[in-house]
């Protein structure tokens, strides 16, 4: 006969009916495999093979099938980023604040000063993949909004800009490691077969903005394009000197400054490659000869002398960039139609520079004009669609040959979090502005974390239906106007109102590397967790009567009274600001005595899920269909939501095991009315997870496959099972008997599975019942040799071992108050390497 809901409740001993026998008789029956199989059949829990079509949507859950296309907002505002500069002497500042730091605090702070990321393999992608075509109908708008976002990050000192293969520029305050690369000298050496070419810079390794002006760059760009000697004063050179350079420089010398579109600019076919390279080498040598006044003997025996460039030789950059700039080629061209881009280019005389350079230049490892990840924009969050957020896709480091094993770190579980934060303190939470962008990244990691764009001309070439990209001639005057279209003209005119002359700047190609840790790499959450936990550890030791705790960028402060909390807030805020940590005071939230943290509400009574999660669960059950197979990917989403609140239900995670089984088998799951009603009843009444209290354990349980024994104070009990049971099942039953007979919330056991409180591997009915009975129970490990219940479980009641007085101390897991972390194992698998390739030649194991 079909199993009724009431019968199911009685099987789980959830009813107060009088038909059920003693617990010691009823509970072992729930471990019976045959009973579990029959219940699964009656509830339709095991019927995974269905022939009718699957349901792919339940309420808002669509699994991996996203039915809503991403929405582009032309009115997106680019968020502003403060000038974030974490103080380099952060350890000294912390020691001034709280005294000597612990070993763990120092180790964590050294880990992020600077952060390092050196994967063994990196895959380089063409610049065309820099900005992802996430919005096919809004390619131009998305391109410029993304470029503006990247420009904002660069101006805020969060990105490096690749200037040459071995140099980069940035804005903001430099760190010491950005000046002392390669022993503080800017030295470029090529291999012997490519000749010997050496340049020297200022000893600090920083080239100031004024020493490398646009005049040099524009002339270098001219030389790369192979212009005639009369087109630039630096391009002319004496034949004899040219010959000597030609003998020493390989014809395939890399281009020098910036990144230009492939094949851009009109190249005179009469100028061959070797003569172009010859002039390029001469110009490069002449240009670099004005960067410093020091002398150095090169390895080939030639002394190279450097002088300062007179300002009178500077020319406007726009003159030198006409031939390489796609934008400025429209300036003097004849309009092809009323929608020709030349109308837009000639709107104003001041078209702005082709390029911008940072306040500082540094030496970097060889960095190609490529990207290692793509970027695109999305809404900042579901509640803020007015601002955009940059999504960086460095997923290559999570798959394939370029996969990196990220370091693991502790996340507080629910019980540890409750033990730590469930108190009668008054709480507030701090908002750290752009938390990831606080942690500096070593410049040697730049070649692995590259983003950028190939320039507007390549995007226009994709849009244009009649564009011709043949023989690398795109950008020449012959097909310059092929990109003109009404759609592009209208888009650019609208964008012109927003960006003005920056349209010209943003239309150029660019390669950027991260100067602060990006959000799209698995190393970043680990580093952020180490950083904030170390800072909170320092704060806790400075104010031992208060509590500071963090998870990622979520920092909470607790004090015994509101006035005390406000004093603490002022002191901690001033301390964090002195370290260079930026807080957003407008987003500081005062919670009172019930803290909202990590999706939970935590008070002196314990922990419950936040209300918005409870409402989601109710909505899910309202939309949940019965007798219809639901796609296992949708089941994943349902289990994700229900699993978050499972610890607050009577039966816990074991109640969801049928769903887990269907997901593991990648089969559809059909909710029967009885199973849905059972789950719904579970989740409509949520019970708080209470804080564990310290105490002395005086109740012990033990079992053998054939019997069980209890020691409750000086009383001893024993019993036998009808049939032999697996040892873990027997131990779990003994613990349940101890809880039900004594009512104690502290039980001693020698079984590790019972200690773990994970009952999902037991027979389904027993797991649900055991979770119900043992909810809120704490366990203490007692060795078998010392367990007072060991003898009764073996049928020996006459022998009485002395009663142990086992103290129990609630654990806060690895999220302890003083940032204690386990020692590093002696051998680690291949993962991120923390030795800089600039100083150490790493060899694979």
UniProtKB/Swiss-Prot annotation:
Catalytic reaction annotation: DNA(n) + a 2'-deoxyribonucleoside 5'-triphosphate = DNA(n+1) + diphosphate; Endonucleolytic cleavage to 5'-phosphomonoester
Stored InterPro entries: DNA/RNA_pol_sf, DNApol_viral_C, DNApol_viral_N, HBV_DPOL, Rev_trsase/Diguanyl_cyclase, RT_dom, Viral_Replic_Matur_Polypro
Entry keyword Glycosyltransferase: no
Binding positions (Mg(2+)): 431, 553-554
UniProt site (Priming of reverse-transcription by covalently linking the first nucleotide of the (-)DNA): 65
Function: Multifunctional enzyme that converts the viral RNA genome into dsDNA in viral cytoplasmic capsids. This enzyme displays a DNA polymerase activity that can copy either DNA or RNA templates, and a ribonuclease H (RNase H) activity that cleaves the RNA strand of RNA-DNA heteroduplexes in a partially processive 3'- to 5'-endonucleasic mode. Neo-synthesized pregenomic RNA (pgRNA) are encapsidated together with the P protein, and reverse-transcribed inside the nucleocapsid.
Protein name according to UniProt: Protein P
Gene designation per UniProt: P
